[in-house]
Amino acid sequence: MENPLMIIIDYNAIAIAGVVTQKMQVDEHLIRHMILNTIRMYNKKFRKDYGDVVIACDHSSWRREVFPQYKASRRKGREESSMDWNEVFRIINQVREEIRDNMPYKVIHVERCEADDIIGTLVYETQEFGKNEPVMIISADKDFIQLHKFNNVRQYSPMQKKFVQHENPRLYALEHVLKGDSGDGVPNVLSQDD
């Protein structure tokens, strides 16, 4: 990596959150404007301390092949929604390609990987063998709390507009595994196996 300092943005999360929280109409120009301004804002806010922006993007997940219930409630919610989610995702994907082709940001989009996988891998890569490089994660996803075990990894939540902190990230990760994750459709360890 040429510049190990990085601001890693959870692209799909910021794009979808913008559409949903702003109650945006499905307008390509408006969604593009929102996504680009959001990225620009975080670049300006954190670049001095954390360097280059890296945009981590979702692809279809290998997890659904292993566990079909993974995020099934989200799919069901979208099906019941009046919003044209196919069009929203088409626009988000198109803007991702435009950013990759025309902007100075690094865009990482890996087949069968979610942004979570990319972010976790990048963080571990920057922390291995005593590198301990500063990393800022832009995401409201609490799954990233487990990465806070590295002292120089910070997380900023666009939803709450504040830093995400936890006094014991290792304990949080253990509890998260044991309790499951209802938002992702992952059962706790006591649930019957399918």
Write out the residue ranges for each language-model feature.
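Domain-level signal for Mg2+-assisted phosphodiester chemistry and nucleotide/NA-binding surfaces
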Residues: M1-E98
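Extended two-metal-dependent nuclease catalytic cores across DNA- and RNA-processing enzymes
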Residues: E2-N3, D49-Y50, K76-D194
